[in-house]
Curated annotation (Swiss-Prot):
One annotated GO biological process: translation
Pfam families tied to this protein: Ribosomal_S11
Protein source organism: Mycobacteroides abscessus (strain ATCC 19977 / DSM 44196 / CCUG 20993 / CIP 104536 / JCM 13569 / NCTC 13031 / TMC 1543 / L948) (Mycobacterium abscessus)
Ranges where the record places region Disordered: 1-27, 119-138
Domain of life: Bacteria
Family of the protein in this entry: Belongs to the universal ribosomal protein uS11 family.
Basic residues: compositionally biased ranges: 13-22
Keywords for the protein's UniProt record, in alphabetical order: Ribonucleoprotein, Ribosomal protein, RNA-binding, rRNA-binding
Name the record gives this protein: Small ribosomal subunit protein uS11
Function as written in the Swiss-Prot or TrEMBL entry: Located on the platform of the 30S subunit, it bridges several disparate RNA helices of the 16S rRNA. Forms part of the Shine-Dalgarno cleft in the 70S ribosome.
Quaternary data: Part of the 30S ribosomal subunit. Interacts with proteins S7 and S18. Binds to IF-3.
Gene Ontology MF terms in the entry: rRNA binding; structural constituent of ribosome
Length: 138
């Protein structure tokens, strides 16, 4: 019989999970990435560390309903609520992408109680880069 290896089939230790400490960040940045299929809202501190995030899929929408403005509204409200728990009161908004949830997400950040400062569009523009997808024929 082979000697037993230490810790081979012994009792498992409980995993130590570290609770994220609540930061107190009064001013942050809201990054809204709106694609044709989804909308992702991330709220960060001034250094760029993510405080809270939400997306249309994370809120509970699936398939083509993720790309609706209503799904973007709920995602932005969810992210704003979580950010307010960390003390965020004012945000600058950076919008990226061509999706339908851009304006709705900005409005719902304001409606959730965050003061919106500057709004800037940071959608990347190709200098004749990749070939775009072919036209749809319906």
């Amino acid at each position: 019989m082979a000697p037993k290896k230490p810790g081979a089939a012994g009792p498992k230790k409980a995993q130590k999970t570290r609770r994220r400490e609540k930061k107190n960040v009064p001013h942050g940045a809201a990054h809204i990435k709106s694609t044709f299929n989804n909308t992702i809202v991330s709220i960060t501190d001034p250094q760029g560390n993510v405080i809270s995030w939400a997306s249309s899929g994370h809120v509970g929408f699936k398939g083509s309903r993720k790309s609706t403005p209503f799904a973007a509204q709920l995602a932005a409200e969810n992210a704003a609520r979580k950010a307010q728990e960390h003390g965020v009161k004012k945000v600058d908004v950076f919008v990226k992408g061509p999706g339908s949830g851009r304006e709705t997400a900005i409005r719902s950040l304001q409606a959730a109680g965050l003061e919106v400062g500057a709004i800037s569009d940071v959608t990347p523009q190709p200098h004749n880069g990749c070939r775009p997808p072919k036209r749809r024929r319906v």
